[in-house]
Amino acid sequence: MMKYGRKYNFGEVIIARVQFTDSFEVKKRPALILFEEYKNVVCAVITSNPKMKGISITKKEGMAVNSIIKLNYIFTISEKMIEKKLFSISKEKCEVIKKEFLNKLD
């Protein structure tokens, strides 16, 4: 369990307990932190499904398996739902994510 009150930062990959909209089941899933405010953490889904569109994040970068960051699937959780931090992505990858996210807003 992560320590409550910790500051979460953009670019951290975490394991979080998530309840998706199509199920009552809570599952542990990797996610990318976009920002944290007032103990609420806004995240982007990370999936290992290679057929999904998004930004790739590889084993070489720290994932257990090659995965996809889905900027079209964003959710907010309480910091209490975060199990642990896995790693932080590179500054270069953060810039790619920011650029892609801003492109989606146009």
Question: Where would I find each of the regions flagged by the language model?
Answer:
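C-terminal terminal-subdomain/extension
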Residues: K60-D106
